[in-house]
Amino acid sequence: MNPRPKLRSPPPSSVVISPGSPPKSLINKMPRKFTRSTLTLATTLFSILALYAFLNTFIFSDPPNNVSSVSFSRNYNTQNLKSVKVYMYDLPRKFTYGVIESYALARGGEKQSDDSLLKYPGNQHSAEWYLFSDLNRPSLERVGSAVTRVMNPEEADLFYVPFFSSLSLVANPIRSNNAVVAPVERPAYSDEETQESLIEWLEQQEYWKRNNGWDHVFICQDPNALYKVVDKVKNGVLLVSDFGRLARNQASLVKDVILPYSHRINTYTGDIGVENRNSLLFFMGNRYRKEGGKIRDLLFQLLEKEEDVIIKHGAQSRESRREARKGMHTSKFCLHPAGDTPSACRLFDAIVSLCVPVIISDHIELPFEDIVDYRKIAIFVDSNTAVKPGFLVKKLRKVSMERVLEYQRELKKVKHYYEYEDPNGTVKEIWRQVSLKLPLVRLMINRDKRLVKREFTEPDCSCLCSNQTGILTTL
């Protein structure tokens, strides 16, 4: 905050007007008629200012203190700014409900004659289903959203491609090395073929060709989703969990949107407090991961003998989720180390559990950072420091109970941003983030039409950072 400006005395030549009446010297030097007009004007201006002050104080005053200024500002902007028009492609069935059906059939399910009977399986990458469902809702149920669905593509600012890319990736069950597999020539479902088929379909669409895909939005929340064709859709706005598997010329914070995982732990419904949180630190997950996730094994070695720390190896299962829910709801801090990629569902499980996240992931990107200050809800520790013997638990034990409560208060304020089923939660915020990309999309469309493409020997970020392309002559 800037210091209050010092009061300055008027210069010697100034006329000081005392309250009550105009100075005599000024009256003597002016015609009486002019002086009366001046006083009338001054009275009118004073009345206008007084009315403005009244309205500003009592009618247009700031929201009450118990209303979050961030939420107020966000809701005000959402309701008052012109919404972005989005056209959702009516994709062939195999890219939407067909993926759900293939997933179910591969697990012993039966074909359904009615798509409404198909149920999208709950998983950490289910954002694709929530966004698809949201755009299919009646417009009256989407009041306040930053985007409006239009049925005429000519009216659209952006085009949403609702391919269930993350579910497609796992439509065929992953079998262990010891599993006995029936001798078949090929799987019934091929994610790679489905990806390529999507591109073939898109390349036939007028609106895809019109702007080279810049105004298209794709969801690929699983780090490996769309891996086969990502170079063909990289111009578009990508909705991703992180950039762990994407090259620098494929994705960036400038162009794309970071999504939260759909949490798998039930939301903590109690109030803030530490009375029932007897454990210092909790973690449950796969101990052995690749790449940046190798730090997990080191953390296991350091922490598994600490008496007030619960750290367990566990795979995905209902029983594991029940155990994780109990652990997160009864611990003060929840560990979030990197996995195969920088992000993981565990962070969002911790947030809705009001368990203060301890993030040890050097390259993590976080969703909604324009409205959420993660320093207020989480503790960050770099990997090299975290693996120093005794450092982590010593640091956490020094955190006062009042400080833990402060973290919990902030977590409670923002946790709705990570609830996909909340009408004012994740889905609404994702669309707001997408709408903010529109000015850049328009810039890139216009820029793209005047430039000559050049071939580079290695990936670059010229599309985002600088003009490393040639100029197209327009004369």
Where in the sequence are the language-model features?
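Catalytic binding pocket for nucleotide-activated donors in carbohydrate/polymer assembly enzymes
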Residues: 323-418
